[in-house]
Amino acid sequence: MTGNELRARFLKFFEDRGHTVVPSSLLIPHNDPTLLFANAGMNQFKDCFLGMEDRGYTRATSSQKCVRAGGKHNDLENVGRTARHHTFFEMLGNFSFGDYFKKEAIAFAWEFLTKDLGLDKDRLYVTVYTDDDEAADIWHHQEGVPRERIFRFGEKDNFWSMGDTGPCGPCSEIFWDNGPEVGCGSPDCTVGCDCDRYMEIWNNVFMQFNRSADGTMTPLPKPSVDTGMGLERICTVMQGVKSNYDTDLLQGVIRHVERLSGKRYRENEKDDVSMRVIADHARATTFLICDGVLPSNEGRGYVLRRIMRRAARHAKMLGFAEPVLYRTVDAVNEMMGGSYPELLEREEYIKKVIRAEEERFAETLDRGLAILNDAVAQLKGEGKTVIPGETLFRLYDTFGFPTDLTADIVRAEGFTIDEPGFEACMGRQREQAREHWKGSGEEGIAAVHKELHNRGVRSVFVGYDEKCSYAAIGSILRGGSEVAEAKAGEDVEIITDRTPFYGESGGQAGDTGTISTGSAHVRVTGTIRPYPDLIVHRGTVVEGTIKTGEACDLKVASVDRDATARNHTATHLLQTALRRVLGEHVKQAGSLVAPDRLRFDFTHFAAMTPEEIRRVEEIVNTFIMENDTVHAREMAVEEAMESGATALFGEKYGDRVRVVKVGEVSAELCGGTHVRAAGDIGSFKILSEAGIAAGVRRIEALTGMGALRHIQELEDEKRQIAALMKAEGGDNIDRLQKLLARQREMQREIETLQGQLNAAKSGDLLADVREVNGVKVLATKVEVDDPKKLRELADTLKDRLGSGVVALGCEKDGRANLLVAVTKDLAGRIRAGDIIRQLAPVIGGSGGGKPELAQAGGSQPDMLAEALGKVYGLIG
């Protein structure tokens, strides 16, 4: 039975028993900052279990995409080395939200395994929580499991909780006996042993208590069930294999790697580990990118980067010199695309993101490995076996080596890594970064706003149809606390029962304006929306005293609102134009819509060409000139999706959504404010296009008068440049070309003179050459205006020597610089890198390089003479 057949069979089994089949959620958990990735089937049902969400069904079943590669589930270093560890896996599950409980859950699990799949009951064992007599009796009396096959374990193994407080309850696990041939051989081996003989295949969690802060547990009024069975594990049972990597779920990728590498699986254990690593990481990488994660140096993106770079290193170990991970996407999609069609829809985009990251890492991999190998060699010579935190940080910060990748590489040499030292370096860097941090705009919900919302304080937004409104002041906040009144000069937050002010959300900046009563005036400098139905005006009382309960007039700053609306509608048109020019893979990855500009982040794998930017500008301006009417309509989310409206990738929407349409060219789910017709935008001009992360580009643009003023500024600059270059008739390009040609000519003259100067200088320096063990050696301090010129001088000296070693030093800006060069005929016997490593500590620095050329820098220029004097003693 294939993995795809098993998945379908499981879902059908529970669908036939009244369960709603629910698609897997994205790997990026929605509105759950406690989770890096979805790592269990119950993640998407968390609010259902807590009684905070009613989905219209009380029984559900799913096959959930999961990733475990960070936090307490960080098994990355074991992936590929064991039979069971994975970064990506699928969790089959059935769930009851106050519907059935232990009797039914146990019956379903036993029936599916023993009757539907036909597993041998004599090879199945169960565990229960030590105090859960109820579950033990159900297993024995209802399902006929002998008492000796029912094992009891404590809270560590068989009790589940959502946190320190909240829903919790006992677990009951089902184990499969793989047979004594895969066990540890101990006569005491039984369920619970760490060996591979007894393998957990299904876990049933019975949520029946609520744990309070003092540890007291009270029964839940509606107990629930959460179960999970790893698809990869049940596949090993059904396919009669001992390793998850031998199932068809992963063998397809391994066979693909065999074909690409020309190597055979199961012929060399080292190669086997690399093939398993690539097979697992290819699945994780493909699914993560498909679900919107992109490689970066923080958060989820950093986990993805670690996975990809570990796979890239193992590909190199298999002999691949060119990027190959992107080529495994075909094999992953061949196996998984039928169940997850989004993989096929985004296949080309996924490949391009992977290849771009592989090429980026390839640029630094060899250099980083050279640094690491030098460090290992030096530490071995000193009798040490721990890679220092400073070295780890340099490899991470300069060459993109995650610490677990470094640990993986040096393990074979018997080395470990100094993780605390690395964290200390990272902490110093974070502290420096924090000094320059200006905030991300993603503020958490303040406690006072939560309290007001829980108390029932609400705001109705009426700003789609009006910019002025009359309302009652429901609450005034000052310094994070609720007050009855506020006086002139005080900063406040004001909540009214209705408001025309748009609260910052969906990338659109909040409105500004004024709030007035008969005796007070407030200047509103910003508006936020901590909850969909709670809008908070922020500002300063500029006159009088404003009081809770008073009636007030609210007036939005019309000029800013209109400018923001122009930019927001233009953003919608921009997305349409980008998809037409670049392709359907373009998805919104973020945006900012403010009165003075717009910013749009989107998924794309390469920098846009000038021609592509020009075409996008032309398309958007054509839409503006066509002046289509802008319509907004609320509808059911299903209707909106069926109509083809564009949704923000990964966003979770309610039952009702607002769809904004611009003629027939754009339709998006959007709650923002817009112009009435496209022509109101006036004009559109792109200011810049740049990459902000792997696979993510950013466009900044202007509309209306802002675009016109920008063009006028460019014309002014052009006139100023023409005047500076004395370009007749404003022919800047012709004049500039002539100036550049003259500059190149002068540069050639300088280089010729520099060569003559070096030759003359080298003639003087050669008088200091000594012969050591049959090798001509020159070690001397020189005066140069730029340390980079040490290399040019060394090349000249090597040519004049014919065969020998040149060591040069110079002082510049209070720093010592050293360079060692070895002629090619001696590089096999004398290594420049070995010499420089001996000299660098003398000048208080570090260095490295290749056999023929190495450099070092240090903080003690007064020690240059001593360092250079050591060179002669290092020539063997």
Curated annotation (Swiss-Prot):
Keyword GTP-binding: no
PROSITE patterns cross-referenced by the UniProt entry: AA_TRNA_LIGASE_II_ALA
Main location: cytoplasm
Top-rank lineage group of the source organism: Bacteria
Cofactor: Zn(2+)
Reactions catalysed according to its record: tRNA(Ala) + L-alanine + ATP = L-alanyl-tRNA(Ala) + AMP + diphosphate
GO cellular component: cytosol
UniProt keyword Metal-binding present: yes
Residues where Zn(2+) binds: 568, 572, 670, 674
Compartments in which it is found: Cytoplasm
GO molecular function terms noted in the UniProt entry: alanine-tRNA ligase activity; aminoacyl-tRNA deacylase activity; ATP binding; tRNA binding; zinc ion binding
HAMAP family, sorted: Ala_tRNA_synth_B (MF_00036_B)
Function statement: Catalyzes the attachment of alanine to tRNA(Ala) in a two-step reaction: alanine is first activated by ATP to form Ala-AMP and then transferred to the acceptor end of tRNA(Ala). Also edits incorrectly charged Ser-tRNA(Ala) and Gly-tRNA(Ala) via its editing domain.
Family: Belongs to the class-II aminoacyl-tRNA synthetase family.
UniProt-recorded name of the protein: Alanine--tRNA ligase
Source organism per UniProt: Geobacter metallireducens (strain ATCC 53774 / DSM 7210 / GS-15)
